[in-house]
Amino acid sequence: MPELPEVETVRRGLEPAMAGRLIAEARVNRADLRWPFPPRMAERLTGQRVLRLRRRSKYILADLSGGQSLLIHLGMSGRMLVSGAQLGEFFHDHPAPSRHDHVVLEMEGGARITFNDARRFGAMDLVATEAAEAHPLLAVLGPEPLGNAFDGAYLAARLEGRRTPIKAALLDQRIVAGLGNIYVCEVLFRAGLAPGRLAGSLSRAEAEGLVPLIREVLLEAIEAGGSSLRDYRQADGELGYFQHTFRVYGREGLPCVTPGCSGTVGRIVQSGRSSFHCPLCQR
């Protein structure tokens, strides 16, 4: 599933084609994805101007001129693709239609935004902009890891006394929003913390030290366009490249990259997810 860096990369890719532009025509090609689309969604989107695109955790919000926001979740395999527009150095022509093209937005200026989702775990909804943060998908979320509200004191307080593994705590969207399996593995490796260690056992210094590492990993991943392991593509259809710099994720059986360490990357399963770690470096 796309995590914060992938969603932020897609948001940035959509912005030139959508922000400030009118939705000339919206087409909805089925009744639902993970959940039913809101009633008359195509009609309600057509003629609306996109005021801005923003991200909350793993969700994109397109604020519209009529006072509503289009809430977008990519799910497992969803892609928001831009065509008919100049993106960077290249013009991206419209691709042939696919049976997995579920929502199409024809934008003022000739760009087309296509929501393609083969597995249909994605979602779209319309919500009043002023009440967007109260939407059931957003209301439970913790602070943004790149925002000012997420600091060492906050994280230390939230981890204190917790008897869940530190990995599970960082994946808890109520504690910090947007982190997923890949980036938590990478953060814990850089921090030298074992994924199975109890969150409440961290010293205050260890807990506070996670914050700059979380930001470091996320910003590096955004700069690389995210991580493409299976379905993820940027808005222009290009792959992300952060997977080429993974230090631990997906490297089971390979030597640890820490200078002077003789360890081998191992894999354990926690709550159905693979956790990659160095048993020598991470304690």
Swiss-Prot record:
Enzyme Commission number, as recorded: 3.2.2.23, 4.2.99.18
Gene Ontology biological-process entries: base-excision repair
A Pfam family assignment: H2TH
Catalysed reactions, semicolon-separated: Hydrolysis of DNA containing ring-opened 7-methylguanine residues, releasing 2,6-diamino-4-hydroxy-5-(N-methyl)formamidopyrimidine; 2'-deoxyribonucleotide-(2'-deoxyribose 5'-phosphate)-2'-deoxyribonucleotide-DNA = a 3'-end 2'-deoxyribonucleotide-(2,3-dehydro-2,3-deoxyribose 5'-phosphate)-DNA + a 5'-end 5'-phospho-2'-deoxyribonucleoside-DNA + H(+)
Entry note: cofactor: Binds 1 zinc ion per subunit.
Residues binding DNA, per UniProt: 100, 119, 162
Function noted in UniProt: Involved in base excision repair of DNA damaged by oxidation or by mutagenic agents. Acts as a DNA glycosylase that recognizes and removes damaged bases. Has a preference for oxidized purines, such as 7,8-dihydro-8-oxoguanine (8-oxoG). Has AP (apurinic/apyrimidinic) lyase activity and introduces nicks in the DNA strand. Cleaves the DNA backbone by beta-delta elimination to generate a single-strand break at the site of the removed base with both 3'- and 5'-phosphates.
Protein name as annotated: Formamidopyrimidine-DNA glycosylase
Species per Swiss-Prot/TrEMBL record: Cereibacter sphaeroides (strain ATCC 17023 / DSM 158 / JCM 6121 / CCUG 31486 / LMG 2827 / NBRC 12203 / NCIMB 8253 / ATH 2.4.1.)
High-level lineage: Bacteria, Pseudomonadati, Pseudomonadota, Alphaproteobacteria, Rhodobacterales
